[in-house]
Amino acid sequence: MPGTKAAHGRVGRPPATSRTQILTAARRLIDQSGWEKLTIRRLAAEIGVAPTTLYHHVRDKEDLLFLLIHEYADRIPHPDLPAEPRDRIVVCALAIHDSLAAWPWAAEVLTTDGFIARLSDSALKLVEAILAAAVEHGCTPEQAVHVFRSLWYYSVGEILVRAHSPGRRPDDEPPARTTPFLDGLDASELPHLAALGDRWVSLSRLDTYPQGLCAFVDGLLAQTPPTTAPGVDG
């Protein structure tokens, strides 16, 4: 019968691959093996398409990672911002930290100074809020950038140390190899460390980021006295 042969063959184009499908599969591979092992070829195999198909949607692996970060940033609810500039900086920095702590691989991708230029408008809103609050406090625009960069280094450093340290989460058991962490120290040379001993391990597992952040913000802003409203003596 005419058409019988065609009925058993491949008819038409294969189903289109959507960006959502690509990003979902990429997140799955990152969860399984880490972002370092994600490749365009592995992603194509996961979806069941040729690698060339993916290049219609992304330029390269770096572009793919930033698309994932943009999508994630778009889904993060922004906090209500306090009126006081100092408190606003703290709230914004906490929001940035907490969102990246839930996705620590993204913090690792963003550990280059040029990352700001690659972020979406949604991701930049908290950065803008920190700069605006610093300027409102009395910083110059240049000082405001230094405030943000200092807080960024502190936040990302804390996230990556915890992400790469087994047993750092409160619900984890500390690794056996850290049990004798400070045993055998010479108390005459290192009296404070020797006195702490294994308590260092439990102390280092405490979440002190919020307290450290507040102290850091206060120290940074102390270098620039707050502006005084016009007509107010002092």
Segments predicted by a language model, with ranges:
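C-terminal all-alpha effector/ligand-binding and dimerization domain
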Residues: 201-202, 206-230
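Short glycine/proline-rich, acidic loop/turn segments that cap or connect secondary-structure elements
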Residues: 179-195
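Short, basic, alpha-helical segments at the C-terminal edge of helix-turn-helix-like DNA-binding modules
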Residues: 70-75
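N-terminal intrinsically disordered/low-complexity leader segments
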Residues: 1-17, 192-199, 228-234
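Helix-turn-helix
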Residues: 21, 25, 29-63, 67
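Hydrophobic alpha-helical connector segments
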Residues: 77-125, 141, 148
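Hydrophobic alpha-helical bundle segments that form small-molecule/ligand-binding pockets
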Residues: 126-148, 154, 158-177, 201, ...
